[in-house]
């Protein structure tokens, strides 16, 4: 019997003004045709660069993680057809959990995307979203607070 549970967290109030400053996080990025960024300390400049890439729907996979990479982390996959993010909490522990974007149109479906991720795998459409501005807000809010953006479900 599986202990996996899925439930939807309702949308909270969108944050009008994000806090300033960044959490101590490190950035890893794989982008088509570009050299990878490996465990680079997150700065305002590389956060702004990542947000621009998300807005333009550039095909990439990015991760924001703690310095030792063994704790909580936030990942985003972007391609022209869809965007998906995942926030993993208590990585590797008994109470590990993950939170992800979702697409209401595919919530009860196992259908996969017809375009792969930057890593070559396919994404279940239930875990995707279409709004690059909202996806960028989710990334920026996590980078500044270490928490999920309350304006997204």
State the predicted function of each range.
Residues 58-63:
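Short, hydrophobic/aromatic-rich segments at coil-to-beta transitions
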Residues 1-55, 77-78, 84-153:
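Acidic, proline/glycine-rich low-complexity IDRs
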Residues 66-83:
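Short, structured protein-protein interaction patches enriched in aromatics and acidic/basic residues
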């Amino acid at each position: 019997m599986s202990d996996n549970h899925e439930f939807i967290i309702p949308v909270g109030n969108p944050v009008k003004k994000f806090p300033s400053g960044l959490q101590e996080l490190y950035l890893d990025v794989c982008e088509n045709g570009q050299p990878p960024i490996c465990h680079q300390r997150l700065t305002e400049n590389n956060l702004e660069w990542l947000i621009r890439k998300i807005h333009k729907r550039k095909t990439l996979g990015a991760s924001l993680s703690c310095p030792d990479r063994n704790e909580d982390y936030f990942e985003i996959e972007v391609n022209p057809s869809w965007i998906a993010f995942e926030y993993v909490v208590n990585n590797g522990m008994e109470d590990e959990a993950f939170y992800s974007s979702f697409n209401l149109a595919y919530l009860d479906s196992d259908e996969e995307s017809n375009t792969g991720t930057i890593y070559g795998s396919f994404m279940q459409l239930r875990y995707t979203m279409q709004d690059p501005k909202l996806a960028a807000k989710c990334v920026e809010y996590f980078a500044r607070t270490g928490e999920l953006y309350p304006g997204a479900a």
